[in-house]
Amino acid sequence: MARLAGVDLPRNKRMEIALTYIYGIGPARAKQLLEETGVSPDLRTDNLTDEQIASLRDVIEATWKVEGDLRREVQADIRRKIEIGSYQGLRHRRGLPVRGQRTKTNARTRKGPKKTIAGKKK
C-alpha cells in the first residue's frame, strides 16, 4: 500500500483517483502531479514502483502544502478573520454561511438541524 503525505492510498483505484484522497489534491492537481512525475494515470496504486512513489512524494513535498500543514493554515486564516473582527469572521463565529448565501431557507449544513418552535395553540 502506497503512503503519501501521511495518507494510505486505496490499493485498487487508479492513481488519478487515489491521489484525491490526500487533502489539498483534487482532480486537476492530481493530473498535473502525474504529468510532472511521468506516472500513468491509469496505473493502479498496487502497481507503483518504489521509485514512482518516491518521485510523487518529492514533488508533493516540494510544491504544495497538503494535509496537516494546509489544514493548519486554513484554521489560522479563519482565526485571524475572527480576531480582526471582519464580517467573515463574525459569520464564522456565529456558525453561519460566510460567502453571502441565503439563510432564510436552506443553510442547514452550516446551521445544523432545525430547532422547532411550538406553534400557537387554539
From Swiss-Prot:
It comes from the Bacteria. Pfam families: Ribosomal_S13. Keywords: Ribonucleoprotein, Ribosomal protein, RNA-binding, rRNA-binding, tRNA-binding. InterPro entries: Rbsml_uS13_C, Ribosomal_uS13, Ribosomal_uS13-like_H2TH, Ribosomal_uS13_bac-type, Ribosomal_uS13_CS. GO terms for cellular component: cytosol; small ribosomal subunit. The keyword Hydrolase does not apply. GO terms for biological process: translation. PROSITE patterns: RIBOSOMAL_S13_1, RIBOSOMAL_S13_2. Gene3D superfamilies: 1.10.8.50, 30s ribosomal protein s13, domain 2. Residues 93-122 are annotated as: Disordered. Located at the top of the head of the 30S subunit, it contacts several helices of the 16S rRNA. In the 70S ribosome it contacts the 23S rRNA (bridge B1a) and protein L5 of the 50S subunit (bridge B1b), connecting the 2 subunits; these bridges are implicated in subunit movement. Contacts the tRNAs in the A and P-sites. Belongs to the universal ribosomal protein uS13 family. Part of the 30S ribosomal subunit. Forms a loose heterodimer with protein S19. Forms two bridges to the 50S subunit in the 70S ribosome. This is Small ribosomal subunit protein uS13. It comes from Corynebacterium efficiens (strain DSM 44549 / YS-314 / AJ 12310 / JCM 11189 / NBRC 100395).
